[in-house]
Amino acid sequence: MKKWQFVGTTALGATLLLGACGGGNGGSGNSDLKGEAKGDGSSTVAPIVEKLNEKWAQDHSDAKISAGQAGTGAGFQKFIAGDIDFADASRPIKDEEKQKLQDKNIKYKEFKIAQDGVTVAVNKENDFVDELDKQQLKAIYSGKAKTWKDVNSKWPDKKINAVSPNSSHGTYDFFENEVMNKEDIKAEKNADTNAIVSSVTKNKEGIGYFGYNFYVQNKDKLKEVKIKDENCKATEPTKKTIQDNSYALSRPLFIYVNEKALKDNKVMSEFIKFVLEDKGKAAEEAGYVAAPEKTYKSQLDDLKAFIDKNQKSDDKKSDDKKSEDKK
């Protein structure tokens, strides 16, 4: 697992440098805010959090956001254990994860921070795979189609080299739900998305899937595949098709926050406000797609209402205590 201490450009060395230099414009804005909020989770969401922290650190040199990228599933495990304040996720929380949180009396808030399109790509030299439907993808990743000819009789009789994220990734869960229909993924699995990209670029018969941002970063070495299903015509992932959901493998990206952390940790609540007020700009900079503006506005309104409600509750408790002390 790669762990980043995000305060600016993410790596620990950069964190120390930013602290020594005052975090760029540190000292302005809400510079009296001090403390830390801890998170972990999706490697897909991680680049967005990185971009957000580059902006956050400019005005909050003493308010640190530390986040790992252990994968969505592993992030939720830590969230359930109470080890972190927030979990980054590239899929919605599962029912069994909700139940475990409920069993521990942990309440949470879900925030949609961006949109993504799981991109299917083949080797740049592949000159025959331009589009696939979900049934063909399922045949490839279930192992039933062993050669390209098994997928389409007009294609070469060459063995397919299919690569997938491993089960710790939300991208794996999303693909399993959207494409596999409960069948097991029988392909080479890797925890490192960059290794999946590398495998496809090095193997002429390679095929892999990953977040849109990983394709954007490597599009000179990969060939994207149009995807279709019964609801969507063959479409490639673009900012437009991902945002309007006309791309068949579009999905939202999330940050889940412990309600107690929102109430008690000013760094956590201010950071989430900052995320929503950014309105997806950091997501766009990281190669993903902003959600519709109304999504950020409605969530920000809900967050402010939640914070105000709890502040009033705290004030009332304080007043009640003072009254009790006077008796």
From Swiss-Prot:
Tree of life domain: Bacteria
Protein topology in the membrane: Lipid-anchor
GO MF term (any one): phosphate ion binding
Signal peptide: 1-20
Record text on subunit structure and interactions: The complex is composed of two ATP-binding proteins (PstB), two transmembrane proteins (PstC and PstA) and a solute-binding protein (PstS).
Main subcellular location of this protein, as a coarse class: membrane
Region (Disordered): 307-327
Protein name (Swiss-Prot/TrEMBL): Phosphate-binding protein PstS
UniProt keywords, alphabetically: Cell membrane, Lipoprotein, Membrane, Palmitate, Phosphate transport, Signal, Transport
InterPro entries: PBP_domain, Phos-bd, Phosphate_ABC_transporter
GO biological process: phosphate ion transport
Localization per record: Cell membrane
An example Gene Ontology CC term for this record: plasma membrane
Lipid-modified residues, N-palmitoyl cysteine kind: 21
Keyword Cell membrane appears in the UniProt entry: yes
Covalent lipid sites (S-diacylglycerol cysteine): 21
Family, as annotated: Belongs to the PstS family.
Stated role: Part of the ABC transporter complex PstSACB involved in phosphate import.
